[in-house]
Amino acid sequence: MQWVKLTLHFPSFFSYRIPDYSSQYALSVPLPSPSAIKLSLVATAIRTTGNVAEGERVFYAVRDADIRILPPEQIAINSVLIKRLKKKKNPTELETFEKTFGVREYVFFPDDVNLFIGCDDIDIAIKYFGMLRYLGSSDSMLYVKCIEKINEPPKSAIKAIADKEFAEAISKEPYIVYPVKDISKKAKFEQINPYSGKSGRNVFERKYYLIKARIKKGKKWKLLEIQC
């Protein structure tokens, strides 16, 4: 397996809704999920080349990739009440949407985020790493400051773990737990291609980020002090 380290800088806020949470109460995972990272690389390949076949090639190169993240020492999370437009159940020609309210969480990284990607076919996707423009929601903009090949990621880097490892890990130490999604090793490109007409079922599998951190809280904010 070959490893690449990406140094990511988020000039603004990051937001990525916890899987299966309501869009009206959209709490955020404090780090991008493995599926978000992999699908962003696929989308970047298609966007920059205009070639869906190239996106498919990158998909199979990164589908089974090992993803690790080393966050900054602190992560700030703000909770915001926003106005939103929701599609009406019985829309009319003049009124398609209705005004509602929702809660959003936005994550602020005071320093860079280090992302580690390990896979066998890293050379297929490596040229697209530096072209990443967002992770998570489309307004979670970023730019890649540095790309370098490494032997292996540091042990302190966070990895999304499956159910079996999760049960064992939390029995030993206390963690802050965030559910995330990864792409199944059985997933096909047609299932994530919105124009293929194929079923998107069983594309993702649930995993968990276990984060060692102290939490400071206010009424509409919290601060995670990461402990590696």
Curated annotation (Swiss-Prot):
Protein name according to UniProt: CRISPR-associated protein Cas5
Family the entry assigns: Belongs to the CRISPR-associated protein Cas5 family.
Intrachain S-S bonds: none
Physiological role: CRISPR (clustered regularly interspaced short palindromic repeat) is an adaptive immune system that provides protection against mobile genetic elements (viruses, transposable elements and conjugative plasmids). CRISPR clusters contain spacers, sequences complementary to antecedent mobile elements, and target invading nucleic acids. CRISPR clusters are transcribed and processed into CRISPR RNA (crRNA).
Organism: Archaeoglobus fulgidus (strain ATCC 49558 / DSM 4304 / JCM 9628 / NBRC 100126 / VC-16)
GO process terms (BP): defense response to virus
NCBIfam families: CRISPR_cas5 (TIGR02593)
Keywords: Antiviral defense
